[in-house]
Amino acid sequence: MVNSLLFGEMALAFGCPPGGGGCAGGGGGGGAGPGPSPVTAALRDDLGSNIHLLKGLNVRFRCFLAKVHELERRNRLLEKQLEQQQSERDRRLRYKTFSREQAVQTGPELLRPSAAGSGQALGAATGVNANAVALGGLPPGGGSHPQHYGRLPGTIWSYTQVRRTGGGGVETVQGPGVSWVHPDGVGVQIDTITPEIRALYNVLAKVKRERDEYKRRWEEELAKRMNLQTMVDTLQEAAQEAEAIQEEMNEKIERLKAELVVFKGLMSDPMTDLDTKIQEKAMKVDMDICRRIDITAKLCDVAQQRNSEDVSKIFQVVPKKKDRKVASDEDISEQDGEVNRFSDEEVGSMNITDEMKRMFNQLRETFDFDDDCDSLTWEENEDTLLLWEDFTNCNPTIDLQGEQEENLGNLIHETESFFKTRDKEYQETIGQIELELATAKSDMNRHLHEYMEMCSMKRGLDVQMETCRRLIKGSADRNSPSPSSVASSDSGSTDEIQEDLEREADVEPMVS
């Protein structure tokens, strides 16, 4: 039954009932869901065949046990019958055999005194007539002496019991009878108590069987209760451990949430710095674009003046590069005033050469001042023109934040799994170390007990040696040895005793 239950649980674990052909969802050819895999089907068939085989073996074993019990019962009955046959064989030599139970009443005529021969003949005739009447071969009045059927109260009955055995034989037992007075004059048999005793024995046997059955059931229930109690204790311990683990996980989650907030704050600071830098760069670009527009307008004015005037006059006075640079430095302070001074009304009266010099100096100043912009080297095309749309990709999006949070969650899970693995390894190492410590402790205790036994044996031997030494010394004193030998023996014995005491003193701290 244990194997069948085990295979049933395995079959339920694979998703199919233990005794059925297939799962409910997989039956039928037109099912909507996909069918089971070949490995699952093969395993299911194997489990089904094994369960069927185990059930058959279980039934056969039960039948075999029933047959064995039946044969044992029959054997006991046959042994009892054999004993009864043997006892019957011994009793047949002492008792008469009758075909049925018969009670014979002794009448007044049979009780009269008569001669020995006539009494014996009368008794024989009476017995023959009684047997004939019992067998139904003779009529009631066909004997040599008439039968007396009067049953008077208070007379003596001779009782004969016929016992039938199982082998077909008949056993008779004759009793002396009883004297009993009844209003109807009916005698009562003594052996009527035997069936009641047998019934009492049967009732007692039945009660004993019921008691044994109840005791067996009580033991089974007690074992089940103990198993359930241990299971409940185990589940309570597991629940407590789960609660502790849940509390630890909640603490970890709170700590990780706080760390996540800190990480978000750390990430938001560089993002804000980047936004400010982007805005500053965009403002510089806008200012450069406006400056380029102004320079282009001034260049157009210069070109118009060049076309209207003689070109040779423009480049009349062209000093050296150093002189021109010094002049440009001197004219920097006068730039704003001259720009405002030379309005559209006074353009015709000014020298075009001075205007061109001023414009070139202004361009050079602009070029040397804005090194980061490089406005003169740019070309307005799609590759170099910077607008606000170029910086939209720098802003963090929600998808990027979600990916970062997902990566952080994966990192947290990996860290937790790593910690769990390390915890398991630590637990295994601790268990191994505890086992080794227990083994070492047991070995130390065993060695200590052995050492104590050896010390006790040594003390016993020392006592025996001291006793022998004293006996030898006493015998030597009785033999009256010389004083020198006595002194030497005494000194030797004292030296040995002192050495033994020193050894015991060395051993005692080691034992403690």
UniProtKB/Swiss-Prot annotation:
Disordered: annotated segments: 473-512
Domain IF rod: 50-479
Entry's Gene Ontology cellular component terms: intermediate filament
Residue stretches of biased makeup (Acidic residues): 496-512
Pfam entry (one): Filament
Source superkingdom: Eukaryota
InterPro entries for this protein: IF_rod_dom (IPR039008)
Protein name stated in the entry: Intermediate filament family orphan 2
Family: Belongs to the intermediate filament family.
Name of the coding gene: Iffo2
Composition bias, Low complexity: 480-492
Keywords in alphabetical order: Coiled coil, Intermediate filament
